[in-house]
Amino acid sequence: CIRDSVYGIMKAYCTRVGSGPFPTELFDETGKKIRDLGHEYGAVTGRERRCGWIDLVALKYSIMVNGVTQLIMMKSDVLDDFETIKACVAYKVNGEEIDYFPYDISEGLEPVYAELPGWKTDMTKMTSEDEFPEEFNAYVTFLEEQLETPIKIVSVGPDRGQTIERYTEE
């Protein structure tokens, strides 16, 4: 029942506006590609948003503190053209690997990534979960397992009709 659920909305990758810590920020062509494909520019100022791979450590912490029971993943289609998709599953701090969100994230966090195969498929025309490529399903399953939270809805484009409900078990 929707009234018994707390939905968390996330992107298939991470963005940040303004300064501050962003462990998975990409300063290379990959970051630029995500920014361009995701139209990650400020609506008023046109300022570039900072882009990076999904940070599952930070997301898991956010899910916990907000009591999220189900997730909605937006902008899945932005990752359609990548050979490899990365997801931060831990951080290295002073040479030690940790899988929790530390008290002080101001500096010294190095992301530890899991790499998954990209789906290299245009998902924008898909209308049901049955059409999703195997690699995309593997990415979603990986995220669900890492986050211990089901992803119930995914978007495969900016239009309302490009929002697909998944038939996951609760």
Residues covered by each model-derived region:
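Non-transmembrane, aqueous-exposed alpha-helical and coiled segments at domain scale
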Residues: R3-E170
